[in-house]
């Protein structure tokens, strides 16, 4: 299984979850876990996504998600799960 972590941060607005999820669904990427919160109008979301059966490669999916983030006015960071874990280990 090939998994990536998608992090989204920015000012809260309608459609962020829908916009990011739409890109994943269109590319046959499966959301395994999702957590999101809003703190004083700041939106933060993290998703664990299985891209094993995705229609596009990692680089293409990353670009599409980043483009969707720009359109939504949020920052999107996409990392392979192992890199994310390495960067956030204690």
UniProtKB/Swiss-Prot annotation:
One GO BP: DNA-templated transcription
Pfam families: ACT_6
Xref: Gene3D superfamilies: 3.30.70.260
InterPro entries membership: ACT-like_dom_sf (IPR045865), ACT_dom (IPR002912), UPF0237/GcvR_regulator (IPR050990), UPF0237_ACT (IPR022986)
The ACT domain, residue ranges: 5-79
GO cellular component: cytosol
Family: Belongs to the UPF0237 family.
UniProt cross-references to PANTHER family, sorted A to Z: UPF0237 PROTEIN MJ1558
Protein name: UPF0237 protein MJ1558
Organism this protein belongs to: Methanocaldococcus jannaschii (strain ATCC 43067 / DSM 2661 / JAL-1 / JCM 10045 / NBRC 100440) (Methanococcus jannaschii)
